[in-house]
Regions:
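Glycine-rich Rossmann-fold phosphate-binding loop(s) that bind the pyrophosphate
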Residues: 147-148
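Short, well-ordered coil/turn residues at beta-beta hairpins
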Residues: 6, 46, 67, 186-190, ...
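N-terminal glycine-/charge-rich "phosphate-binding" loop or analogous flexible N-terminal tail
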Residues: 1-42, 287, 295
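Short beta->alpha connector loops at strand-helix junctions that form conserved
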Residues: 28, 67-68, 84-95, 169, ...
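Rossmann-like dinucleotide-binding domain for NAD(H)/NADP(H)
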Residues: 159, 209-297
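Rossmann-like adenosine-cofactor binding region
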Residues: 52-55, 164, 170-251
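Phosphate-binding beta-alpha-beta segment of Rossmann-like dinucleotide-binding domains, i.e.
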Residues: 82-84, 90-141, 156
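N-terminal Rossmann-fold NAD(P) dinucleotide-binding loop
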Residues: 151-152
Length: 297
């Protein structure tokens, strides 16, 4: 069975999946990917959109396996029309994302990127001048929007550090209260028609911090930029953006109170190992005609 992992992986990862009979094709290799499409039966997908055009060019495709949980980068309707199964892997990256969320919170509170820049530029004492904006997590109220696997791991970490946790989900809590009364707000929601631009930073508590390791489209990015520039928000820790890859001249990147990462909260060696194992199990099940794990379409 022709299985292709569409991802810019390391040499070690390439060797690992080759040993399993899986071909690794870099997301940046558009020509190579197009050449593989006619023969692909199983596509392991990370972030490069699986469009209707991609699906149409893959006549043998039987399974699109999301490496991760969010399937907003897959044209699920096009796959469904072709009878192609779509599966995800909930939980394989939860600990990695929870830890990265905590890291971004602390980096915002301690202005970590600016401190590193000051030390490297031999401006040691200049960094001390930021002291009035340094803060601790203990004693703060942290609002979690969404309460799935990631926030359930994150909440006890925050409480162990002295934070008070409140949350909103589709079944519990009040959205406006959590958004408007939290000292820090962390996003843990899927991106869909109901959640797109759900979060307006202007409705957050003045001086609060926004952390997003879910999807960039959850936030009104223009409003976020305004809130960070005028001081309504103290800082933002962002692993995801409305447009990815992000332009180097994006105005958010020019702000000193933005801590950013290139959508890697999920990406650890442990996450990849768990994901490859689970994805291989679905390959086995597909070949054996057994029910697939975590099928969403």
């Amino acid at each position: 069975m022709k299985v292709v992992f569409h991802f810019d992986g390391s040499e070690a990862l390439a060797a690992r999946v080759r040993s399993l009979g899986v071909h690794l094709c870099a997301e940046s290799d558009a020509t190579g990917f197009r050449a593989l499409l006619p023969e692909i039966e199983v596509l392991w997908h990370v972030l490069k959109p699986v469009t209707a055009e991609v699906i149409a060019a893959a006549p043998k495709l039987k399974l699109i396996q999301k490496i991760g949980s969010g399937v907003n980068t897959i044209d699920v309707d096009a796959a469904r029309r072709r009878g192609i199964a779509v599966c995800n892997l909930p939980g394989t990256n939860s600990r990695a994302v929870a830890e990265m969320t905590l890291l971004l919170m602390l980096a915002c509170l301690r202005r970590l990127p600016q401190l590193g820049d000051a030390v490297r530029a031999a401006r040691w004492l200049d960094a001390w001048k930021l002291q009035d904006s340094f803060g601790e997590l203990g004693g703060r109220t942290v609002g979690l929007l969404g309460y799935g696997a990631v926030p359930r791991l994150l909440a006890p970490m925050l409480e162990a550090m002295g934070a008070k946790v409140q949350y909103w989900s589709r079944s519990a809590g009040d959205f406006a209260t959590v958004l408007g009364t939290s000292d820090m707000v962390s996003l843990h929601l899927p991106l869909n028609n109901e959640t797109e631009r759900l979060v307006d930073p202007r409705r957050m508590k003045r001086g609060s911090i926004l952390v997003n390791t879910a999807r960039g489209g959850l936030v009104d990015e223009a409003a976020l930029l305004e809130a960070l520039k005028n001081g309504h928000l103290a800082a933002a820790g962002l692993d995801v953006f409305a447009e990815e890859p992000m332009r180097a001249d994006h105005p958010l990147l020019a702000l000193p109170n933005v801590v950013c990462a290139p959508h890697v909260a999920w990406l650890t060696q442990q996450t990849l190992e768990r994901s490859v194992g689970a994805a291989m199990e679905n390959v086995r099940r597909l070949g054996a005609g057994e029910p697939l794990l975590h099928r969403v379409a």
